[in-house]
């Protein structure tokens, strides 16, 4: 196969996003030593607006749009995203070419004073940017106070260290990628904090017309992770199609079978619906839709319709 002479990766400029882009850069450089692989760092709208909760300003698609523009106008050949930030429906003209092997999918409890969530006194302030985490926290620990936490990973840790929060909840994978695993006091079992759709996996997006890149990027695709993430995204698409609602899903492959658990909740956690399904790994989208149907049968549509739409 003739690999291109050059490849440009579009990435957000945060430390975590650049780590992820550099990881993919290294993989590509190893696969194609003759190809020059460079990174185009970009500041996205989501990185610039830090004084409002994500749900209010348009959701996680704000982290993706500028990168897609770079793909559309030819400044970049591929974009690297955290899969949990990728909107459920890509705009026309774009495609996911590969999903990398999943890292730790769990949420991490980070605190300077407490060993785990159960040890937090009533009234403690916990920071998170995620309605998914907020609803699960409030359902399990209604005595805690959950407040919005924005900014990159280092900013969030600084706010914790300044005493603005008793604890914060972050993605374990991000902390580990940046060499900050020592900050994790507890990795929360997915049974107790169902991860975001795609959490821990990286997605590689391309201009859909660049069919030449599909073979080039194919070695980066991890079929088992891709099946799990596609099942999770299938559930989310069937229910809401947005990153910014209190839902989560986590799929695992065992042999030829996918097992998946998902939930939908009110933001305050007072209404909480959870279901599980299993089915053939070669039909991930259908499995996601089946899980969504089970949640709808329990009343998920009513909960989602009652959420504030800003």
Curated annotation (Swiss-Prot):
It comes from Methylobacillus flagellatus (strain ATCC 51484 / DSM 6875 / VKM B-1610 / KT). Binds 1 dipyrromethane group covalently. It holds the Pfam family Porphobil_deam. Keywords: Porphyrin biosynthesis, Transferase. This is Porphobilinogen deaminase. SUPFAM superfamilies: Periplasmic binding protein-like II, Porphobilinogen deaminase (hydroxymethylbilane synthase), C-terminal domain. Monomer. InterPro entries: HemC, Porphobilin_deaminase_cofac_BS, Porphobilin_deaminase_N, Porphobilinogen_deaminase_C, Porphobilinogen_deaminase_C_sf. One of its GO terms (molecular function) is hydroxymethylbilane synthase activity. Pathway: Porphyrin-containing compound metabolism; protoporphyrin-IX biosynthesis; coproporphyrinogen-III from 5-aminolevulinate: step 2/4. Its cofactor is dipyrromethane. The porphobilinogen subunits are added to the dipyrromethane group. The gene is hemC. One of its GO terms (cellular component) is cytoplasm. GO terms for biological process: protoporphyrinogen IX biosynthetic process. Coiled coil: none annotated.
């Amino acid at each position: 196969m003739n690999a291109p002479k050059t490849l440009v990766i579009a990435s957000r400029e945060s430390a975590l996003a650049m780590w992820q882009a550099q990881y993919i850069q290294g993989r590509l450089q190893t696969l194609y030593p003759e190809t020059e692989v460079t990174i185009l760092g970009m500041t996205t709208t989501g990185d610039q607006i830090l004084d409002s909760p994500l749900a209010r300003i348009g959701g996680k698609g704000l982290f993706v749009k500028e990168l897609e523009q770079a793909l559309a106008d030819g400044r970049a050949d591929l974009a690297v995203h955290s899969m949990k930030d990728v909107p459920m429906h890509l705009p026309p003209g774009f495609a996911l070419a590969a999903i990398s092997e999943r890292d730790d999918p769990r949420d991490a409890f980070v605190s300077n004073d407490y060993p785990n969530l159960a040890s937090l006194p009533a009234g403690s302030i916990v920071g998170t940017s995620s309605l998914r985490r907020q609803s699960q926290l409030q359902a399990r620990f209604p005595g805690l106070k959950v407040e919005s936490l924005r900014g990159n990973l280092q900013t969030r840790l600084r706010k914790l260290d300044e005493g603005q929060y008793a604890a914060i909840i972050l993605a374990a994978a991000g902390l580990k990628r940046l060499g900050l695993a020592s900050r994790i006091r507890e990795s929360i079992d997915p049974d107790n904090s169902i991860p975001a759709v795609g959490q821990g996996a990286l997605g590689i997006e391309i201009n859909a017309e660049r069919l030449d890149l599909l073979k080039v990027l194919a070695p980066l695709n991890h079929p088992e992770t891709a099946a799990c993430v596609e099942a999770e995204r299938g559930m989310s698409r069937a229910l809401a199609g947005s990153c910014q609602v209190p839902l989560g899903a986590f799929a695992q492959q065992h042999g030829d079978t996918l097992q998946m658990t998902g939930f939908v909740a009110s933001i305050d956690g007072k209404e909480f619906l959870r279901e599980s399904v299993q089915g053939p790994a070669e039909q991930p989208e259908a499995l996601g839709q089946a899980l969504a149907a089970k949640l709808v049968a329990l009343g998920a549509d009513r909960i989602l319709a009652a959420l504030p739409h800003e």
